[in-house]
């Protein structure tokens, strides 16, 4: 994905300082400071059904989307040489906009993936298959597996294993019993059951599968860290060797998982949350294979719902956007299609964007500004009386090694291996692309 915050400033009206037009100066700040500070903005920008909130960054995003849409649609409307970035961007946008074909295909793109889950014969095979699906975007595993900088040694990357597996995101949705939470949970159960019936299950089977999914996710949620616990950096860092991982968590087939996810061999890993991972071991051992397959099936359908026909999209929107977030109206199809293209080819779109709206001269000016700030800060560090010479030296060394990122990278991502053929039926597009279409939730 690419950031357009600074770039937009070169194509928009320049605003400096605090705008009194966005305030309500008739309100008393001591009584209602929010109305005083933002009343003018709220009156000038009444909330539309598409949004649950609307601030200045949302307005900036709207402006950017309109500019990006113009760039993308220009490529989509005119033939592009096969294999070029323009062809890939235009073809993907057209695929995302083609609701007629998607409605005609229905669940056809999903059938091979569901068949793969339903054909699992053992719990050992289950772990391999869900890892393979996870790599393709189905999020079928019960934990997250990735790579990030080691928090105790930023010069090194480290494999991270973290809690996951719960579609509602926050554990309290599964555990609290207040009326609002119960309403969300009941809507979630109805949503799970609806997705199963939409892929062909009868009501009885869909009910049974829904109960299995909810039971598994609730068990994971009970062991998961709360939002407060997740803010404890040190409490979410448990570095160990790969050998120790195999010893401490024998209920998970780590070799099958690692290879299916495409990870090379590695020596060290951090299990960020210990207890949820042990709970996954219990679930894999205690639940029947049919229950585990029901969980994986739901994760696959849920991940792809926004990429399928309008009925699946509506079901996903009604739960995640309307019930969970309060939005009353879905975004226009073009906005969702732009989101799809950004999700798959964001760097390529970003390259086109900066060529038009953020020229190299603008980047050079901003880099020079940052360099001047570094010099000024360095002089201030040297003049500090309370800082020891050794500490000053370390601070200046850190300042000089500050990696500046402005506007866009010096080296762009290579998309040459990515093939998007607009002439193919949507069902022939790989599941990776199908998942990419689901990014605009």
Q: Where are the regions that the model predicts?
A:
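Bacterial Sec-dependent N-terminal signal peptides
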Residues: 1-13
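Short, Gly/Pro- and small/polar-rich lid/capping loops
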Residues: 13-21
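Signal-peptide-cleavage-adjacent N-terminal segments of secreted and extracellular proteins
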Residues: 18-19, 27-30
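Active-site-surrounding "flap" and adjacent substrate/cofactor-binding loops of secreted or lumenal enzymes
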Residues: 29, 36, 40-93
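Secretory-pathway/luminal and periplasmic proteins that interact with or process carbohydrate-rich
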Residues: 41-44, 168, 219-228, 375, ...
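Intrinsically disordered, low-complexity linker/terminal regions across diverse proteins
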Residues: 61, 248-251, 270-274, 331, ...
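Noncatalytic, helix-rich "gating/capping" subdomain that lines the substrate-entry/channel surface
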Residues: 75-368, 372
């Amino acid at each position: 994905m690419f950031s357009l915050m600074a770039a937009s400033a070169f194509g928009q009206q320049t605003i400096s300082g605090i705008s009194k037009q966005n305030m309500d100066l008739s309100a008393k700040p001591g009584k209602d400071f929010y109305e005083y500070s933002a009343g003018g903005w709220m009156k000038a920008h009444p909330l539309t059904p598409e949004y649950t909130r609307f601030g200045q960054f949302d307005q900036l995003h709207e402006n950017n989307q309109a500019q990006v849409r113009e760039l993308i649609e220009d490529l989509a409307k005119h033939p592009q040489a096969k294999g070029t970035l323009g062809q890939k961007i235009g073809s993907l946008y057209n695929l995302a906009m083609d609701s007629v074909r998607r409605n005609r295909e229905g669940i056809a793109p999903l059938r091979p993936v569901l068949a793969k889950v339903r054909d699992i014969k053992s719990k050992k095979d289950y772990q391999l298959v869900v890892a393979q699906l996870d790599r393709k975007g189905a999020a079928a595993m019960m934990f997250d597996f990735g790579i990030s900088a080691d928090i105790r040694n930023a010069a090194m990357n480290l494999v991270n294993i973290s809690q996951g597996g719960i579609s509602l995101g926050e554990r309290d949705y599964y555990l609290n019993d207040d009326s609002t939470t119960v309403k969300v949970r009941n809507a979630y159960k109805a949503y799970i059951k609806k997705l199963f019936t939409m892929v062909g299950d009868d009501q009885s089977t869909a009910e049974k599968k829904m109960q299995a999914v909810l039971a598994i996710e609730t068990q994971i949620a009970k062991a998961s860290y709360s939002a407060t616990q997740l803010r404890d950096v040190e409490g979410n860092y448990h570095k160990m060797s790969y050998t120790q991982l195999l010893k401490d968590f024998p209920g998970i087939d780590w070799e099958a998982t690692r290879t299916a996810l495409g990870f090379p061999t590695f020596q060290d890993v951090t299990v960020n949350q210990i207890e949820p991972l042990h709970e996954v071991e219990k679930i894999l051992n205690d639940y029947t294979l049919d229950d585990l397959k029901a969980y994986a099936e739901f994760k696959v359908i849920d991940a792809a719902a926004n990429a399928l026909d309008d009925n699946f999209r509506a079901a996903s929107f009604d739960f995640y956007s309307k019930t969970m977030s309060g939005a009353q109206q879905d975004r226009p199809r073009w906005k969702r299609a732009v989101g799809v293209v950004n999700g798959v080819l964001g760097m390529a779109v970003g390259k086109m964007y900066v060529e038009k709206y953020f020229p190299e001269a603008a980047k050079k000016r901003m880099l020079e500004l940052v360099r001047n700030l570094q010099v000024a800060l360095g002089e201030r560090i040297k003049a500090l009386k309370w800082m020891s010479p050794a500490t000053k030296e370390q601070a200046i060394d850190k300042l000089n090694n500050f990696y500046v990122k402005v506007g866009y990278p010096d080296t762009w991502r290579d998309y040459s291996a990515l093939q998007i053929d607009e002439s193919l039926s949507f069902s022939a597009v790989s599941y990776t692309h199908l998942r990419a279409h689901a990014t605009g939730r």
